[in-house]
């Protein structure tokens, strides 16, 4: 079903991050090419090695990887992506995207993408009810 499709899976700092390992596994079983981009805070909840093992691809965290291979990684990923799924999406990352802040690998890549972007919020109810989080239509997501 997803053979030949590239899914960028953004994982942010939320307790729900551990659940995304199962999602990555299901996407892989559907033959998707999965690139996992984690925020630094996400690594406090789940180890990048988990995603590397499940997807067979390097998990990207740092925007400026010292193993530079003659491509600007976030731009190359954005061009390859058929869809971006940010799950779990913390209030922090939603706020950054809504305001055009691109200060890590995930948000920088999202800013360069021209494909559909799906955001799956995961946060405290009061945080979720904040107008910035609620009005994702402002950023056409």
Language-model features: where?
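N-terminal phosphate-binding or glycine-rich loops at protein starts, especially the Walker A/P-loop
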Residues: 1-40, 117-121, 134
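Glycine/threonine-rich flexible loop motifs
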Residues: 91-102, 127-130
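Short beta-strands and strand-loop turn motifs
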Residues: 87-90, 116-125
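Conserved small/polar residues in nucleotide/adenosyl-binding loops
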Residues: 139-141
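A short, gly/pro- and small-residue-rich
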Residues: 99-113
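Glycine-rich oxoanion-binding loops at beta->alpha junctions
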Residues: 52-96
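Glycine-rich, charge-decorated loop segments at or immediately adjacent to ligand/cofactor-binding or catalytic sites
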Residues: 46-47, 121-133
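Glycosyltransferase specificity loop/lid
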Residues: 37-49
């Amino acid at each position: 079903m997803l053979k030949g499709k590239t899914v960028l899976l953004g994982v942010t700092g939320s307790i729900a991050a551990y659940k995304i390992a199962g999602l990555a596994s299901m996407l892989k079983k559907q033959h998707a090419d999965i690139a996992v981009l984690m925020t630094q805070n996400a690594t406090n909840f789940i180890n990048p090695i988990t995603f590397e093992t499940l997807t067979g691809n390097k998990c990207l965290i740092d925007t400026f990887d010292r193993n530079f291979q003659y491509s600007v990684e976030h731009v190359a990923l954005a061009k390859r992506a058929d869809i971006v799924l940010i799950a779990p999406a913390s209030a922090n990352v939603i706020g950054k995207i809504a305001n055009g802040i691109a200060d890590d690998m995930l948000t920088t890549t999202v800013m360069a993408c021209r494909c559909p972007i799906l955001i799956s919020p995961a946060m405290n109810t009061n945080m979720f009810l904040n107008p910035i989080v609620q009005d994702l239509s402002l950023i056409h997501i």
